[in-house]
């Protein structure tokens, strides 16, 4: 990474990034992508509550993420930790602790993250090859008592 040729033009990054968002929210979504040096930059200012992240051109596969703007402090901290090579459960532990300590603001209401993955983005067609869309619904400060959801996955209790 680091060469301008490695980074797709802003319009291509935007077209791919917004595909993770619900169709009715795509046009007004803010988009964070990559500049010529491979650093994260704002490609488009948002007009609604969605923020979308363009796929990292340094990675072999495609992934775009879109989420409610109230999740941005939490997501930005996750990107900072990844840059520091803090990954997996350790990254989640750090962020969750910082939320509990009030260091990272977190929405009080549920918010959704949309993640679209695939083998590649075809700029000419605007389609993601071998695509898969998943949702993550963040329910901050929820407990088993407030949601009825277990604290462990089913495999660990069956």
Predicted stretch roles:
Residues 152:
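Short, surface-exposed ligand- or partner-binding patches at beta-edge/loop junctions that are enriched
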Residues 47-49, 132-136:
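Extracellular structured ligand-interaction cores
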Residues 33-35, 54, 116-118, 139-141:
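Pocket-edge structural micro-motifs
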Residues 61, 69-134:
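Mature extracytoplasmic domains of secretory-pathway proteins
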Residues 67-68, 138-140:
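Helix N-cap / beta->alpha transition motif
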Residues 144-148:
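Substrate-binding/catalytic groove segments of enzymes
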Residues 3-93:
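N-terminal secretory signal peptides
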Residues 157:
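Conserved small/polar residues in nucleotide/adenosyl-binding loops
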């Amino acid at each position: 990474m680091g060469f301008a040729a490695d980074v797709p033009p802003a319009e291509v990054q935007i077209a791919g990034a917004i595909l993770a968002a619900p169709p009715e929210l795509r046009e007004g979504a803010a988009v964070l992508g990559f500049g010529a040096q491979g650093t994260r930059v704002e490609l488009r200012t948002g007009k609604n509550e969605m923020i979308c992240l363009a796929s990292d051109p340094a990675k072999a596969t495609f992934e775009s993420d879109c989420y409610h703007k109230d999740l941005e402090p939490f997501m930005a901290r996750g990107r900072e930790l990844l840059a520091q090579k803090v990954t997996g459960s350790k990254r989640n532990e750090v962020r969750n602790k910082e939320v509990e300590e009030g260091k990272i603001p977190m929405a009080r209401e549920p918010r959704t993250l949309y993640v679209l993955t695939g083998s590649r983005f075809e700029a000419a067609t605007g389609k993601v090859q071998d695509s898969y869309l998943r949702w993550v619904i963040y329910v901050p400060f929820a407990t088993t008592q407030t949601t009825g959801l277990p604290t462990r996955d089913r495999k660990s209790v069956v």
